[in-house]
Amino acid sequence: MNPPITDMAALGRQLRCPEGALAQEVADYIFASNEYMIRQTIDRLFLTSGERILEVGFGNGGHLPYLFAQGDNLHYTGIERSEEMLLRAREQYMSLIEQGKAVFLKATEGAMPRLPEEAFEVFFSVNTYYFIQDLRGYFERLYPMLTHGGRLSLGYIDKDFGERMPFTKEVFTFYTNEQIGQWLLEVGFSSFGISSYTEEIFSKNGRTVTRPFHIAMAIK
């Protein structure tokens, strides 16, 4: 699937926060490009029935049926900075909202909404950390929201690969696995580990590209 925007700088800004007339097309492009990574990140959570899940950056929400198929009586809280994506999710998944199985919240700029302590057993996010200015501080604010033994799963593309992409020059910041692990451990997480993968994707000119990505996992 080709990106709906040919201006790479503009595409990068839309990947950060889909908005305007192209928001839906951009969000669908993001999901199509990242579905495998999203599913792998969810799989690393090893969800069990009744768990409460927090996700930052749910995009078009196309992965939620897969997520809810992982266990019974799951409860999902999704946080998203894009107003268009928030409205789409609330409309598309109204039945989950009405059943008390899902909540969709608006993120403030670069900050985690205030949520109760020990409210979630699991947290995951895919391709979002690049846009957070103070990532260590973000992990620090997230930590109290997880229960004791709570699990974190963070999916992201490899730093060297990401920095070579034409759309990452403005609003993206990449870190090494070691830096991410150091920050997670500093704020209190333990049992940090990395799983690394590759997948074949299509570039904007139709060529096949091997994209390396990682999933960072940690336990409170």
Per-segment meaning from a language model:
Residues M1-L22:
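N-terminal, positively charged/glycine-rich alpha-helical extensions of SAM-dependent methyltransferases
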Residues L22-I42:
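Conserved SAM-binding loop and adjacent beta-strand
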Residues P113-F123:
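A short acidic, Gly/Pro-enriched loop at the edge of an enzyme's catalytic core
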Residues E121-D134:
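A short SAM/SAH-binding and catalytic strip from SAM-dependent methyltransferases
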Residues R136-H148:
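A short glycine-rich, Lys/Arg-flanked "PGG" loop and its adjoining helix->strand segment in the class I
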Residues S190, E200-K220:
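Core SAM-dependent methyltransferase catalytic element
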